[in-house]
A protein has these predicted regions:
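Phosphate/pyrophosphate-binding catalytic cores of soluble transferases and nucleic-acid-acting enzymes
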Residues: 1-317
C-alpha cells in the first residue's frame, strides 16, 4: 500500500486573514501555496480579488494565480486538473502543497478527488437554459432553482449566472439535485494525508474587516480596474465578471446605479458570500476550526496547525 502524501488545506470566509496565515504556515512547513480561489486565476483583476502581490509572497512560491485572461472560462473541473498537477510537482520537489482559498467546491474536488465526466453535459439542456437566460433573465432561472433545489440555491448568489445555470442544468439533465451530489462528495475519503483547516473569527469582527477591505479596494482603484476590463471588451456575462466587486460595478458603469449604492452593495454581497462559505465549511467532515480570537497572532495559529500536521504524520507512520 502506497504511503499517503501530506496535503494541507487552509480555508475560511473572505477577509478572515488566510493570506497572512498561509505565509506563516508555508514557512513553518517548507511548503508551496496553491491558490484555491476561482477569481485569482485571472490576470488584470488584482484589486477586486484581493490578490497577493509578488512582494507580499515573501519568497513563498504560489501557483494558479494570474494564469488566464479574463475572457477565458474557468470551472471546478479545470481547477481540479491544474491543482493536482501542481500538487504532484510540489511533492516531487520534496515540499508540502498547501491549498489556500475560499472556494469550497474547488477545494472539495481536489481534497476528495470528486469525479467529473465531460460527457455528462446535455447540450440541448445547456442551449435551452442559455436561451432562457437571455430571454427571461437570471432571476427567473434562480427562482426555478430555488423551487427544485432550495439547498443549492441557498449556497449561490442570485446574480452568479454561471453557478445558477450549472446547478439547474445538472438537475434538468440528471434528475438529481446538485446539493445531493455535493453531499455525497463529502462522504468520500481523501487520498491524501489531509490536514483541513478553517480559519474563522467573530461575526461582527469579520463584517468590520469586510467593510474595511471594500473601502480599501475602492480607494485603490477598483472602479478603474473594472472600467479597464469593460474597455477591453470583457462582457459582464464572462465567468470572471461574476466575482463580487465586478458584476456590481457594471451597473455603475452602465449608469444604472450611483457609486455609493454600488459600494454598499459590494459590502452586503461580500457579507452574504462569507455566510455561504461558512455554511459550506460547517458541512465538511474533516475540517478543523480555528477562531482567530483564541490566538495571539498568525504565528501562534500556524504553530498549532503545524503541531497537528506533524501529529498526523506520526500517527500514520
Amino acid at each position: 500500500m502506497c504511503e499517503k502524501q501530506t496535503l494541507v488545506a487552509l480555508t475560511g470566509p473572505t477577509a478572515a486573514g488566510k493570506t497572512a496565515l498561509s505565509l506563516a504556515l508555508a514557512k513553518a512547513l517548507g511548503g508551496e501555496i496553491i491558490s484555491a480561489d476561482s477569481m485569482q486565476v485571472y490576470r488584470h483583476m488584482d484589486i477586486g480579488t484581493a490578490k497577493i502581490t509578488a512582494a507580499e509572497m515573501q519568497g513563498v512560491p504560489h501557483h494558479l494565480i494570474d494564469i488566464l485572461e479574463p475572457e477565458e472560462n474557468f470551472d471546478a473541473m479545470r481547477f481540479q486538473k491544474l491543482a493536482k498537477q501542481a500538487i504532484e510537482e510540489i511533492q516531487a520537489r520534496g515540499k508540502v502543497p498547501i491549498l489556500v482559498g475560499g472556494t469550497g467546491f474547488y477545494l472539495q474536488t481536489v481534497l476528495y478527488e470528486v469525479p467529473f465526466s465531460e460527457e455528462s453535459r446535455d447540450e440541448a439542456v445547456h442551449a435551452a437554459l442559455t436561451e432562457r437566460r437571455a430571454r427571461e433573465g437570471i432571476a427567473s432561472l434562480y427562482a426555478e432553482l430555488s423551487a427544485v433545489d432550495p439547498d443549492a440555491a441557498a449556497q449561490i448568489h442570485p446574480n452568479n449566472e454561471k453557478r445558477v445555470l450549472r446547478a439547474l442544468e445538472y438537475f434538468l439533465s440528471s434528475g438529481e439535485r446538485i446539493s445531493r451530489h455535493n453531499a455525497e462528495a463529502r462522504e468520500r475519503q481523501s487520498p491524501y494525508e489531509l490536514s483541513y483547516f478553517v480559519l474563522n473569527m467573530e461575526r461582527q469582527s469579520l463584517y468590520r474587516r469586510i467593510d474595511a477591505r471594500v473601502e480599501a479596494m475602492f480607494r485603490a482603484g477598483l472602479v478603474e480596474e473594472v472600467r479597464s476590463l469593460a474597455a477591453r471588451g470583457v462582457p459582464r456575462t464572462a465567468t470572471s465578471m461574476q466575482g463580487i466587486g465586478y458584476h456590481e460595478l457594471f451597473d455603475y458603469l452602465d449608469g444604472k446605479a450611483d457609486l455609493l449604492r454600488c459600494k454598499e452593495r459590494v459590502k452586503l454581497d461580500t457579507r452574504h458570500f462569507a455566510k455561504r462559505q461558512l455554511t459550506w465549511f460547517r458541512r465538511e467532515r474533516d475540517a478543523e476550526w480555528f477562531l482567530r480570537e483564541d490566538y495571539a497572532s498568525e504565528q501562534a495559529i500556524a504553530a498549532e496547525m503545524l503541531r497537528r500536521v506533524e501529529k498526523r504524520r506520526e500517527e500514520t507512520r
